[in-house]
Amino acid sequence: MSGRPRTSSFAEGNKQSPSLVLGGVKTCSRDGSKITTVVATPGQGTDRVQEVSYTDTKVIGNGSFGVVFQAKLCDTGELVAIKKVLQDRRFKNRELQIMRKLEHCNIVKLLYFFYSSGEKRDEVFLNLVLEYIPETVYKVARQYAKTKQTIPINFIRLYMYQLFRSLAYIHSLGICHRDIKPQNLLLDPETAVLKLCDFGSAKQLLHGEPNVSYICSRYYRAPELIFGAINYTTKIDVWSAGCVLAELLLGQPIFPGDSGVDQLVEVIKVLGTPTREQIREMNPNYTEFKFPQIKSHPWQKVFRIRTPTEAINLVSLLLEYTPSARITPLKACAHPFFDELRMEGNHTLPNGRDMPPLFNFTEHELSIQPSLVPQLLPKHLQNASGPGGNRPSAGGAASIAASGSTSVSSTGSGASVEGSAQPQSQGTAAAAGSGSGGATAGTGGASAGGPGSGNNSSSGGASGAPSAVAAGGANAAVAGGAGGGGGAGAATAAATATGAIGATNAGGANVTDS
């Protein structure tokens, strides 16, 4: 990309930014290491600035958004990721405003932020200091794909549950992420904790306020975006999450496409031609267009024979044409596919560590859809009694401070699902490969931290992790893949059907002010 990097994270309205704290960046050397000291503001709580020193800085990603560095805080030794983006002085930074509101165990934490001067006159950069998490779901899945395997079903269950929980939280605040994809799902392979990252495309959606449709990375774009809708809802994230789940089950993207038209072709090959009412719900402007009639492909034939029935059912509830018909993220957490996580048993991962926190719901989380509480909580927590119990109280909910409630086997589950046996996954981890390139064509994703991936560089697989990951793999969009199903000639017919959509929304994120 030529020229200056884009200004950061969708400038917020026309609101004048408050005067920026430019305290200067000081550097010195100690024991042969370069130490940088900045004047920073904590990510949450007080606005009182403080000096923060860090060292061992190295670039781990860059793209149109800016640059991401890994560094180590001098005071604590904690590794952090510093996302540096060009700041337009005229506007507030939307990503910063949103991240300061968020506090959840499945969302990457903003530790500090500070401003620094650029080389050009009046050039100012915003630096977001984020907790560092070593891997992404994308890189772990790619390592399995190298050996023609998919991530074991129990890890898919664990990762997707945490994603839905993070979405339930941000959607309850009216915030839409708008770029859900495997590259933006940070993963600690030691603890199996998943955290949603990169809020550079996120926006608080307001009823009646138009939004840009040219948003979200191509393989994960909801059909209403392809149709050019500008009044969409947080359900676009739900569609994207359904694409992620399907991709993890298949080992490749379910709807690969080289353009907006190709994308819709792939969707129609699986879901069939949308009805007139479904088109109206996505974008009323297209209801009069004549689409060739293509039958839907049975979901059971889209996936491998041994894919758990409950997983396929969940995908079908997520990938609905009609946005309002898509399941909510919290309802997804309560889906039977995740019941195994709620079973009482050993609370350990294959490496012997405790399961990540799955049921430490806050009162706010349990108040999102109170009717789901009995389905969300494991029976042994619902039955907890006495003042120290973890059962929701009549007036709201106690904080359910439990970690996992079952063990996760890296070889998959042997439990039956609606009468059919779940598969035993072949093997556990991909080889801890070498190689450092790894970027593939597709959505033009940038590497760590921005629209293309997350804040992470890879650090090699840890013992007991679901995958041993190659060092330094660049995070770009997943390449190719054959999509699920569709009969002979379906692609041609669907392409004809989408001819009117043509140049609308070819994919890619982060391009405008809305």
From Swiss-Prot:
Positions that bind ATP: 60-68, 83
Tissue: Expressed in ovaries and activated eggs (at protein level). Expression is over all the embryo at all stages, no local accumulation is observed.
Annotated compartments: Cytoplasm; Nucleus; Cytoplasm, Cytoskeleton, Microtubule organizing center, Centrosome; Cytoplasm, Cell cortex
Function of the molecule: Required for several developmental events such as syncytial blastoderm formation and embryonic segmentation. Is involved in transcriptional regulation. Required for arm phosphorylation. Wg signaling operates by inactivating the sgg repression of en autoactivation. Negatively controls the neuromuscular junction (NMJ) growth in presynaptic motoneurons. Plays a role in the regulation of microtubule dynamics and actin cytoskeleton during embryogenesis. Required for phosphorylation of sra in activated eggs.
Keywords: ATP-binding, Cell projection, Cytoplasm, Cytoskeleton, Developmental protein, Kinase, Meiosis, Nucleotide-binding, Nucleus, Phosphoprotein, Segmentation polarity protein, Serine/threonine-protein kinase, Synapse, Transferase
Recorded GO MF terms: ATP binding; protein serine kinase activity; protein serine/threonine kinase activity
Comp. bias (Gly residues): 434-453
Root EC class: transferase
BP GO terms, sorted: cell differentiation; chaeta development; chaeta morphogenesis; chitin-based larval cuticle pattern formation; circadian rhythm; entrainment of circadian clock; epithelial cell morphogenesis; establishment of epithelial cell planar polarity
GO cellular component: axon; beta-catenin destruction complex; cell cortex; centrosome; cytoplasm; cytosol; female germline ring canal; fusome
Active-site residue list: 179
Primary localization: cytoplasm
Ranges of compositional bias, category Low complexity: 393-433, 454-470
Residues where Phosphotyrosine is found: 214
Residue segments, region Disordered: 379-470
UniProt cross-references to InterPro entries, sorted A to Z: GSK-3 (IPR050591), Kinase-like_dom_sf (IPR011009), Prot_kinase_dom (IPR000719), Protein_kinase_ATP_BS (IPR017441), Ser/Thr_kinase_AS (IPR008271), STKc_GSK3 (IPR039192)
Assembly behavior: Interacts with cos.
Pfam families linked: Pkinase
Name recorded for this polypeptide: Protein kinase shaggy
SMART domains assigned to the protein according to its UniProt record, in alphabetical order: S_TKc (SM00220)
EC number, UniProt record: 2.7.11.1
Domain Protein kinase: 54-338
